[in-house]
Design a protein with these regions (language model features):
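Glycine-rich portal/gate segments that line the openings of hydrophobic small-molecule binding cavities
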Residues: 39-93
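Short edge beta-strand segments in beta-sheet-rich domains
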Residues: 33, 75-77, 105
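Hydrophobic ligand-binding cavity/cleft-lining segments
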Residues: 1-61
Length: 170
């Protein structure tokens, strides 16, 4: 298994970032996201908002992987919990197909910065595990690990894009 961890900060309050996070699709930095459909949404007894979405992504695959896969779409399950009382957004995202090639999992935690509550801290943990043998699994994991930081930057730019879009309406 390959692991990537990142800690970063948004120069915006948690309330704005969590709202933009829920509305982040579509945006110009996520053209690979074909659709984002809410499967379930509810508020639990503690007042936390739970959301489960199905994302359909279409992206490029390396040539050596395209021979293993016959499709270019991937189905992703995204679960999130927004706790306005604790000012915390937790999310987990993982693929539900192509599991014979790769299991990709991403976990995020958004909360106000401890140094400056007008900013939002984000902690990201990504894990990539491939069951393939003969060195192919390591190759798949290495490819994902190499591309993930670039994808993370695009994801965060998308949130900022949505944040700016909504600011222009106010």
């Amino acid at each position: 298994m390959s692991v990537y961890k990142d800690e970063s900060e948004f120069d915006a309050p948690w309330e704005n970032i969590s709202s933009a996070w829920l509305r982040r699709y579509p945006n110009p930095y996520s053209s690979h996201v074909v659709s984002a459909d809410v499967l379930e949404r509810y508020i639990d007894e503690k007042g936390r908002l739970h959301t489960e979405r199905l994302l359909v992504k279409q992206g490029r695959v390396p040539r050596w992987a395209s021979e293993l896969l016959n499709v270019s779409k991937s189905y992703i399950l995204e679960r999130s919990i927004i706790d306005a009382n604790k000012r915390e957004l937790l999310s987990e995202t993982f693929n539900i197909d192509h599991l014979k090639l790769l299991k990709a999992m991403e976990y995020n935690r958004y909360q106000p910065s401890q140094e400056d509550s007008s900013k939002t801290s984000i902690t990201t943990l990504a894990q990539f595990a491939s069951p393939l043998r003969l060195g192919l699994g390591r190759r798949v994991q290495k490819y994902c690990l190499k591309r993930f930081p670039e994808q993370l930057i695009g994801s965060r730019r998308g949130i900022l894009y949505v944040l700016q879009k909504y600011k222009s309406f106010s």
